[in-house]
């Protein structure tokens, strides 16, 4: 009797699975072939309307578009180069410069702060609960927050 119940339940399981293979994925079952063809036609029309990246756009067309926008683009030669956040204006006599041994550059300070955050024992990147600690449940069993620790 036990083997017949197992056989019957297996046959019922297979019978329900075979006719509706798309039943497990309702997204694919709800999209018909006609809808897929409509999407394909729409995509083809959009690709036809969009210019290819390889085609060169004439400069006259670009200048007309700039005039329509109302603000012509400034040439790149007028833009000063980026100096890494340092001011090009001369410093005052009493102000320390970036090269003083007593004042390290700002980038060195930022790097040291980032390094300290990364090496901190309770770093937020290692916590699955945003730094919170579950004292009762997860501390000893590994079921709560911070159950997976990175090993070095």
Swiss-Prot record:
Coiled coil: none
Gene Ontology biological process terms, A to Z: cGMP biosynthetic process; cGMP-mediated signaling; female pregnancy; negative regulation of systemic arterial blood pressure; neuropeptide signaling pathway; receptor guanylyl cyclase signaling pathway; regulation of blood pressure; vasodilation
Pfam families found in the cross-reference section: ANP
PROSITE patterns the record matches: NATRIURETIC_PEPTIDE
Signal among keywords: yes
Record-listed Phosphoserine modification sites: 128
GO cellular component, one term: cytoplasm
Alphabetized GO MF terms: hormone activity; hormone receptor binding
Keyword S-adenosyl-L-methionine: no
Spans annotated as Important for degradation of atrial natriuretic peptide by IDE: 146-150
Chain positions covered by the region annotation Disordered: 50-108
Signal peptide start and end residues: 1-24
Positions annotated as propeptide: 25-122, 92-102
InterPro entries xref list: Natr_peptide, Natr_peptide_CS, Natriuretic_peptide, Natriuretic_peptide_atrial
Top-level taxon: Eukaryota
Similarity comment: family membership: Belongs to the natriuretic peptide family.
Site (Cleavage): 122-123, 129-130
Cystine pairings recorded for this chain: 129-145
Biological source species: Ovis aries (Sheep)
Listed name of the protein: Natriuretic peptides A
Post-translational modification: The precursor molecule is proteolytically cleaved by CORIN at Arg-122 to produce the atrial natriuretic peptide. Undergoes further proteolytic cleavage by unknown proteases to give rise to long-acting natriuretic peptide, vessel dilator and kaliuretic peptide. Additional processing gives rise to the auriculin and atriopeptin peptides. In the kidneys, alternative processing by an unknown protease results in the peptide urodilatin.
Keywords per UniProt: Cell projection, Disulfide bond, Hormone, Phosphoprotein, Secreted, Signal, Vasoactive, Vasodilator
């Amino acid at each position: 009797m036990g083997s017949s119940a197992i056989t019957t339940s297996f046959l019922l399981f297979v019978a329900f699975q075979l006719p509706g293979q798309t039943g497990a994925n309702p997204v694919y079952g709800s999209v018909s072939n006609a809808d897929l063809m409509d999407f394909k036609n729409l995509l083809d029309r959009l690709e036809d309307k969009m210019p290819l990246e390889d085609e060169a756009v004439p400069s006259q067309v670009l200048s007309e578009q700039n005039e329509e926008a109302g603000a012509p683009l400034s040439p790149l030669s007028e833009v000063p180069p980026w100096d890494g956040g340092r001011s090009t204006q001369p410093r005052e006599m009493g102000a320390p410069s970036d090269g003083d041994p007593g004042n390290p550059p700002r980038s060195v300070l930022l790097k040291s702060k980032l390094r300290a955050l990364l090496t901190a024992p309770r770093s937020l990147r290692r916590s699955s609960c945003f730094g919170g600690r579950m004292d009762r449940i997860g501390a000893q069993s590994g079921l709560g927050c911070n159950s997976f620790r990175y090993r070095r």
